[in-house]
Curated annotation (Swiss-Prot):
PROSITE patterns the record matches: LGT
Keyword Secreted: no
Gene Ontology cellular-component annotations: plasma membrane
Species whose genome carries this gene: Bordetella bronchiseptica (strain ATCC BAA-588 / NCTC 13252 / RB50) (Alcaligenes bronchisepticus)
Membrane topology category: Multi-pass membrane protein
UniProt similarity note: Belongs to the Lgt family.
Single GO MF annotation: phosphatidylglycerol-prolipoprotein diacylglyceryl transferase activity
Location of this chain's protein in the cell: Cell inner membrane
Gene behind the chain: lgt
Pathway the protein contributes to: Protein modification; lipoprotein biosynthesis (diacylglyceryl transfer)
Bilayer-spanning residue ranges: 17-37, 57-77, 95-115, 119-139, 173-193, 200-220, 227-247
One Pfam family hit: LGT
Record carries keyword Iron-sulfur: no
Disulfide topology: none
Protein name: Phosphatidylglycerol--prolipoprotein diacylglyceryl transferase
Length: 262
C-alpha cells in the first residue's frame, strides 16, 4: 500500500487571496491546449485557423466548460436536489462539475464559433480534439491533489488511503488511472492519428470513442457517487454517459469513412 501524499489544496497565498491547485490545474490545462494549438497553426498543420481564432475559441470554451460542466452535474447527477435548492446551482465553490456536461458546452461553443468564422464544424473539432486530453490530464491531477473522486476499495500494492473517504480503506488511485488513460495515452494516440490527413470528422470520432472507452473502463475502479450508487446493469452514471459517446464516435467514424457516392 502506498501513502497518499497529503498536499495542501492551496497552492499559493497572496494576502487574503488563496489560489487552489484545482483552479491552477484548469489554467495549466488551457495553457497547454493553447501552446500546442499555436504550434500546430504556426507549423502549417492547418491553414483554416489563425492564432487569433485559437485564442477566441479557447476563451469561449472556458465558458462552455464551466457552464456546461455545472449544468451537466445538476441535470445528470443531482436534479432533485437542485430543483429543491435552485440557488445552489450557482455555488460553484462547493464543487460539482460533469465532464460530459462540459463536453456538450464545448460542442455548442464550437458550433457557434464555426458558424461565425464560416468554417466547417469538423474543421474546428478535428483541430481541437487532440489537444483536449491535456486539459483532462491536468484536471485529474487536480482531483488527486484534492484527494477527491477516489477509487473503490482494493488490495493492489499501489492502493492508497484517502483521508477524505473517512473509512481508512485502501483504494484505487482512480484519478491517476484517468490522468494516464484519458489524458496522456489518449493525447498520444490522437496526436499521432491527426498527424496525417484524415477525412473530416474522423479525428473527432476517435476522440469520442477513445475517451468514452477509457472512461467506461476506469469507472470499474472508481467509487460511485454516494448519492447515486450503481445504476441499471451495475453500471455507474459515468459509464452510462460514456456509452453514447462510444456509439456516436463509432457511427461518425463509419459515416465519414464511406467512399464518396458517384
Amino acid at each position: 500500500m502506498l501513502q497518499y501524499p497529503q498536499i495542501d489544496p492551496v497552492a499559493l497565498r497572496i494576502g487574503p487571496l488563496a489560489i487552489h491547485w484545482y483552479g491552477l490545474m484548469y489554467l495549466i490545462g488551457f495553457a497547454l491546449v493553447y501552446a500546442l494549438g499555436r504550434r500546430r497553426i504556426t507549423s502549417g498543420h492547418t491553414t483554416s485557423m489563425t492564432v487569433r481564432d485559437l485564442e477566441d475559441l479557447i476563451f469561449y470554451s472556458v465558458l462552455g466548460v464551466v457552464l456546461g460542466g455545472r449544468l451537466g452535474y445538476v441535470l445528470f447527477y443531482k436534479p432533485a436536489h437542485y430543483l429543491a435548492n435552485p440557488l445552489e446551482i450557482f455555488y460553484l465553490w462547493e464543487g460539482g462539475m460533469s465532464f460530459h456536461g462540459g463536453l456538450i458546452g464545448v460542442i455548442v461553443v464550437m458550433l457557434l464559433f464555426a458558424h461565425k468564422k464560416r468554417l466547417g464544424f469538423f474543421t474546428v473539432s478535428d483541430f481541437i480534439a487532440p489537444l483536449i486530453p491535456l486539459g483532462l490530464a491536468a484536471g485529474r491531477l487536480g482531483n488527486f491533489i484534492n484527494g477527491e473522486l477516489w477509487g473503490r476499495p482494493t488490495d493492489v500494492p499501489w492502493a492508497m488511503v484517502f483521508p477524505q473517504s473517512g473509512d481508512g480503506l485502501p483504494r484505487h488511485p482512480s484519478q491517476l488511472y484517468e490522468l494516464g488513460l484519458e489524458g496522456i495515452v489518449l493525447f498520444a494516440l490522437l496526436w499521432w492519428y491527426s498527424s496525417k490527413p484524415r477525412a473530416a470528422g474522423q479525428v473527432s470520432a476517435m476522440f469520442l470513442m477513445g475517451y468514452g472507452a477509457f472512461r467506461f473502463l476506469v469507472e470499474f475502479t472508481r467509487e460511485p457517487d454516494n448519492f447515486l450508487g450503481l445504476l441499471a446493469a451495475g453500471l455507474s452514471m459515468g459509464q452510462w454517459l460514456s456509452i453514447p459517446m462510444v456509439l456516436a464516435g463509432a457511427g461518425l467514424y463509419l459515416f465519414t469513412a464511406r467512399p464518396p457516392s458517384r
